[in-house]
Amino acid sequence: MKRYLDLVPISAKVHRKQNRMSIFCIALAVFLVTTIFGMADMFIRSQIIKTQAETGNWHIGIQNITSEDAAVIAARPDVAALAPYNVLNYDGKQGYTLAETEVALCGSNDRLFAKIFPNMLSEGAFPKTDNEAMVTESAKDMLDLHIGDEITISTPAGPDMVFTLSGFVENTANLMSSDTYGVFLTTEKLYDIYLTNDNNGLSGYPTVYYVQFASTLNVQSEIENLKSQCGLSGDQVSENTKLLGLLGQSTSSFMIQVYAAAAVLFVLVLFA
């Protein structure tokens, strides 16, 4: 025997079964590790989809800005979508009714259901004119409504308003729990209604602008850039913390906990 390397084939023959078991254990460990982190990733992805369906696919909400400021923000290259949102009669006590049932009047634009809440649109399209409206499925079912039908909204101070239905929206838990219909109008029409009616002393016209960034790789940096460049304070900007947490772009530790659990399982596999 001239070299120690000559022992390798001899050892391989003697320990053939042991070598096969070692290879099997290594392959099994790799499979388990891949499965663990794959399941963690699938869980995070499923939670992101669920959260986007429940709370909307928006990253921040901005309030107390003018429509001109909103237009500037919407034109930024790092903003994929911006949708205004306002509600009258959210508490169901201001006297806006449809067929004697209180309604929450919501004002926005077509990007609300195209980008921010894409899963809420069940049929039709967002109103293109001030004379059109969308209603929730509860109103459709109770009043046997169809696209193209006319509905009449009674107001507390002004005359009744007639709208042509352009589509239907999924019910929300808040509206269902309060036995209230939801009616969606253009932003301009809702503001006109606000000016026409007393609104029981409602002060101001607070509009929230939902913002969806084009990239989610560094949302916190984009938020800070938006604040500094547009002169926004921390009180004006609110985050969709649940969604950002799942995307790893929030101080929320949920996603970190999921991957930490996967890492612990990985260590256990190594020791096994």
Could you say what each language-model-derived stretch is?
Residues 2, 6, 241-248, 258-264:
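Alpha-helical membrane and juxtamembrane elements of multi-pass inner-membrane transport
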Residues 1-21:
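Feature of multi-pass inner-membrane transport and sensor proteins
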